[in-house]
Amino acid sequence: MAKIQIKSETRHELSFFPNSFDDYVPKDSKVRMVDRIVRSMDINPLMDTYDGIGAPPYSPKMLLSLVVFAYINGVYSCHGIADALKYDVRYMWICGGKQLSFATINRFRSNHMIKCIDFYFDAVISILVEKGVISLEEQYVDGTKIESKANKYTFVWKKTVEKNRAKLLEKTSAALAQIKEQIRLNGGSDIKEEDSEPVTSAKDVERSARLCERQAKNLPKAKLTGREKQKLNTQIDHLFKASDKLCEYEKSLDILGERNSYSKTDPDATFMRLKEDAMNNGQTKPAYNLQIATENQYWTNFALYPNPTDTLTFKPFLDKYKKRYGKQSKSVTADSGYGSEENYEYLEMEEMMGYVKYNWFHKEQHKPFKEDAFNQANFYYNRDDDYYVCPMGQHMEPCGQRQTKSDSGYVSVITLYRAQRCDGCPLGSLCKKSKGNRTIYVNHKLNAYKKEAFLLLTSEEGLKHRSQRPIEPEAVFGQMKADMHYKRFRHFGMDKVYMDLGLFGMGFNLKKYLGIKR
């Protein structure tokens, strides 16, 4: 049997002509494409974030290329990127073999990219438009809730803060009155009228506590025993503690603003109910409402909002799209979560084709709904004489108007129509549940918008957009969470979370674009 020849190992041998990292990266490698695209971008906005103090920084183009390539491959943490620089030749090729620490990468993201993330996200979009991949003439809008990095037990509730603040103010006012009375009975000076006003804030309590403290020090020694003076000083100390606590409550209310909750460790996050509910008990968790617009499954716009419902995000989100690109898209498609009178009016003012569903869009097309004669949506309406006709043929005349205000401050006008003689009606038990004559509430403006939306949604173009919507933003969210494992934010604060999302959006778009071109 012939002797087996084994090639020698050269691991520990020195080479006179060592290979470069360039030799290990194929010419058509994705990392070369990413690096080429990133280096074609304008670097000035990123350079403007450096102050020129201290040691020379690493190349911003190199760092941007490194971070974007990491996000393309699902590596989002600074430690993960730093580890990849040790073991992955593609990352080594980007940095020329430099071993960057996680702190260097973190400073680049948190101190520099955070200030110009929109510029570079837009730069990627410009490349996609130039290549003809997207046109910015259509946008498919949807939202999802992404959990914050904060713990789920760090909640602060607005109602609880307001209740505790009111109780503490009431308790403090009573204690303050008792202290002032005790000072007066023991020879203290009279309380000025302006200092006798009820306390309504932490500053008021602190001012009153200092006044009482000064007067307590000037009391005649013969008037109070040592124990009584100690008790008085303790009561005054409690006033200062109450002032500090009230200051905390007021700070919490400032952070809350119009929100109902926030997280102590991530004050920008709001507690919301998420679909990922392992205990199935409806538990709320700190999260952000992420809104994105897509075209051909590319991100074209993104924003974060503190409110859990999508209705209030529609207008500011489209305004941001207009600000980002200097124009609105010709059409927008969204689900029924965005269908409101305010949003339809906005689309009309912007002259956009809005393929936006409304509540009951699907339900009102079902046979039981259409054949329900007692449903006010099926009542005959005489537009000329402004009256409805009930199932018994009785006219329902207008009897007043009401105004409702949404959370955004938008005012809607509701007209009331009431039948005149419902007593003894054979259909009364089927037609109404309350006593008296039946009253219906009608928003004519919203109904007109709904009719217009129905015609758009059921048109040939509308059917096309409706069939496209489930495979646009919803598919993107599926890829984002299931394929790229981006399910929870890794930063505290709106600015850093937004920066992280921007980098993810850049990576997502480039990953899809490069995948198409290969």
Predicted feature locations:
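Hydrophobic alpha-helical membrane-insertion signals
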Residues: 1-32
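Glycine-/proline-rich flexible loop or hinge segments
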Residues: 15-19, 44-53, 61-71, 89, ...
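Basic, short loop/linker segments at the boundary and entry of helix-turn-helix/winged-helix-like folds
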Residues: 25-68, 444
